[in-house]
């Protein structure tokens, strides 16, 4: 995939790992199928793409930006397989930055409530983002601005920015509220 993209694009100096699966499970009820899907899509694919990007890219001003999740900073027992795969992606961000420097800078973005997931009602999503410190939904453009920031700042690597309206610090998670996500 990396070789194909490089052959088709005039400039290819940035890989953004954004694909993700987000299914709810817990330690008590996760199954092998969901576990494998989460690890394959959320961690294995970015690892392989990052490896191939590092092998096939020239020059020094190259970037990998991993879209992680604020959940890596505010752990809950919900979305067990998803959270483990995203904490793995967080670690991949750090370790691949060390491996690929100085040719490739690797950073991450940990968004909060940006888009309503397919299982949520509009009301539940609204309650979710209103429970953040800033009481607002994250705008996709704010995430795009962070991508632009990482690309333009050549001295930044191994950083993960939370763009989560303060969710990772103050979100009233279901485990705290004794509720159900």
Model-flagged regions — what are they?
Residues 140-163, 168:
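C-terminal substrate-recognition "lid" of short-chain dehydrogenase/reductases
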Residues 26-27, 34-36, 128:
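Substrate-binding pocket helix/loop in short-chain dehydrogenase/reductase
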Residues 11-13, 56-68, 102-104, 159:
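Active-site loop of short-chain dehydrogenase/reductase
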Residues 18-23, 166:
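Conserved NAD(P)H cofactor-binding loop of Rossmann-fold oxidoreductase domains
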Residues 63-88, 93-101, 113, 167:
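Catalytic loop of short-chain dehydrogenase/reductase
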Residues 1, 16, 49-53, 57, ...:
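Hydrophobic positions on the long internal alpha-helix
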Residues 90, 100-114, 156-163:
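Conserved Rossmann-fold SDR core element
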């Amino acid at each position: 995939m990396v070789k194909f993209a490089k052959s088709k694009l005039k400039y290819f100096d940035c890989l953004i790992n954004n694909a993700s699966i987000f299914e709810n499970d817990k330690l008590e009820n996760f199954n092998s199928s969901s576990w494998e899907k989460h690890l394959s899509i959320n961690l294995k694919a970015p690892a392989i793409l990052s490896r191939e990007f590092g092998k096939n890219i020239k020059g020094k001003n190259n970037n990998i930006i991993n879209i992680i999740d604020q959940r890596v900073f505010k752990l809950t027992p919900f979305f067990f397989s998803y959270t483990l795969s995203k904490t793995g992606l967080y670690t991949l961000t750090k370790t691949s930055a060390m491996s690929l420097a100085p040719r490739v800078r690797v950073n991450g973005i940990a968004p909060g409530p940006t888009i309503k997931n397919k299982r949520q009602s509009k009301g539940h999503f609204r309650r979710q983002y209103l429970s953040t410190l800033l009481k607002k939904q994250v705008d996709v453009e704010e995430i795009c601005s962070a991508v632009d920031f990482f690309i333009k700042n050549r001295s930044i690597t191994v950083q993960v920015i939370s763009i989560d309206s303060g969710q990772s610090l103050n979100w009233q998670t279901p485990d705290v509220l004794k509720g159900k996500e």
